[in-house]
Amino acid sequence: MPEPRFLVVRLGSLGDIIHTFPAVAALRESFPEARIVWLTHPRWSFLVKSSGLESEVQTVETRALSSLRDVIRRLRQDSWNAAIDYQGLWKSAMLPFLGGVTRRIGFSSATIREFGVPVLYTERVKTSKEHVAEQNGDLSLHAGAQRGTAPVNLQIPEREQASVCSILRAQRLERYVVLSPGGGWRSKCWPAERFGALSRKLRESTGLRCVVNSGPGDNDLAAVLVGSSGGAEPFVYSGNLGELMALLKGAACVVGGDTGPVHLATALNTPVVALFGPTDPARNGPYSSAEATSSGQKNIVLRASGVRTTHARDSQTHPSMLTITVDAVFDAVCRCIGVPR
């Protein structure tokens, strides 16, 4: 009997891919000999490969006509048992449709935000699950997996680990807390000034020095954070994705909003303090498998009560993020890392 051949479509972003890994892990667990081809944006090829779940990664730039033509041609040259669109957007659903995949699995209209997308699927899955990772798991179940989600073990290349260890050693950083102030939506970000005040409080009360994850476009935020830290000397670090993984893996705790680095830290089994405002942590919060939770991974989510969930992108901090105080986050970090307050 020929091996099953699955096309997994999840183009981005960092957090969304992290929340897709458990569902694909369940698919791999149920079909260990399957050929699983993951279609994603070139930026995330390294991340997908770090999961070890794929047989092959194909990349596509959906805004580049030549890239679209190339990937559609490659899809048409192959044969597939099914394509599973975990993204649920027009740009993701059209690829297996135009690529001639005859069995195309995706969410029903009740789950998808872009109107009309399910018309491109041959099989539409209704889900009652709340968290997106478990919603994704329902697609894997529909494709034949024995369970919806399974544990994921991300691999960090030795070169990136050695590079980060060398830098941290030079800074005399053995135990540290990572602060991740940035994010794709500024509305989901906690103010950089408060991160700075948190850094100062942690240094003064626990002796721990913080490392600031400064991603693309975060230089100004990092500068404000350092300037607000009262001489706590947080170390600003910028690196590639593999180095970020090594940095997060070695942290005592990671603090940030509903952003990729926080979800990546959770996938690496590093405790997180996640700060939520406009988005709902029940749907988009840090997701740990039952195995990770039973092994003692601690995650703490802070969100003001009564906040109305919205996915509207805004360039200003959402008012609900301002209700989260420095003292509340400090207390959560202390609980997370097991030090007295």
Locate each region found by the language model.
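Catalytic machinery of carbohydrate-active enzymes
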Residues: M1-R341
